[in-house]
UniProtKB/Swiss-Prot annotation:
Family of the protein in this entry: Belongs to the DapB family.
Paired cysteines (S-S): none
Protein name per the record: 4-hydroxy-tetrahydrodipicolinate reductase
Protein's organism: Chlorobium phaeobacteroides (strain BS1)
Positions with a binding annotation for (S)-2,3,4,5-tetrahydrodipicolinate: H135, G144, T145
Length: 248
């Protein structure tokens, strides 16, 4: 399978390495984040993988969709445009799979957090909060993974109604608010944790990334799955769709 990479930064280089190490796929082309991209830029490709920045992704999206080559997106920071992007994908007849984090380990972690949030929901003495740490070069704050975890907690636990992630506030956090704390520190790859507390217990569900290989390998696997899915049913997909089908 031939991959075109949009973005040649740290994650782009990791995806390149994962493709070359697969023995199954090849890199068709690598496009820099500031390259002028058109529909023809993806001719001959089977899958596009985008690890750029929010603004570049949104500018390049129409050309990627017009090419009808399925797109795997790891670029974060465009959550507010999610409904617009989903509509664009559906109208184009192409396919796009988005995940804030393609690490299979992180996605196991997210599902564990969701289940823990569901299990404590009936017990009002249990509270839950979420935190994350990343390197100081990371642009979005909180991380896309943290926001996805927060959404999953709200879906699983009806006692939490909204997310609060401000750096400071002049009031206490209400019981129905889910606090999401973010720290930017040095060169930390990525740490996420859900903290659960009651009068008698402290429970911590956590994940620490040791390197970027897990993110890159998951993106390549998701691309292979999406290319097949595109021939059957084009549309907008997430990592949950991929895992649900793979895990049965």
């Amino acid at each position: 399978m031939k991959y075109t990479l949009v973005g040649n930064g740290r994650m782009g280089q990791q995806v390149l390495g994962a493709i070359e190490a697969s023995g199954e796929h090849t890199v068709h082309d690598i496009l820099d984040v500031d390259a002028e991209i058109s529909e023809q830029s993806f001719s001959g490709s089977d899958v596009i993988v985008d690890f750029t920045v929010r603004d570049a992704f949104l500018v390049n999206l129409p050309a990627m969709l017009a090419s009808r080559v399925p797109v795997v997106v790891g670029t974060t920071g465009w959550d507010r445009e999610m409904s617009i992007v989903r509509s664009m994908v559906e109208k184009s007849g192409s396919s796009l799979l988005y995940s804030a984090n393609f690490s299979l380990g992180v996605n196991v972690f997210l599902r564990t957090v969701r289940e823990a949030a569901r299990m404590i929901a009936p017990f009002e003495d249990f509270d839950i909060a979420f935190s994350e740490q990343h390197h100081t070069a990371k642009a979005d704050f909180p991380s896309g993974t943290a926001l996805r975890a927060a959404e999953m907690i709200l879906e699983a636990n009806s006692r939490k109604k909204s997310i609060i992630s401000q750096l400071s506030t002049d009031r206490k956090i209400e019981p129905d608010e889910l606090q999401v704390a973010a720290i930017r520190l040095g060169s930390v790859f990525g740490q996420h944790a859900a903290a659960i507390n009651s009068e008698s217990d402290d429970i911590v569900v956590s994940h620490t990334a040791r390197n970027r290989k897990g993110f890159a390998g998951g993106a390549v696997q998701a691309g292979k799955w999406l290319a097949q899915k595109h021939t059957e049913q084009p549309g907008f997909y997430t990592m949950d769709d991929f895992l649900d089908e793979v895990l049965g």
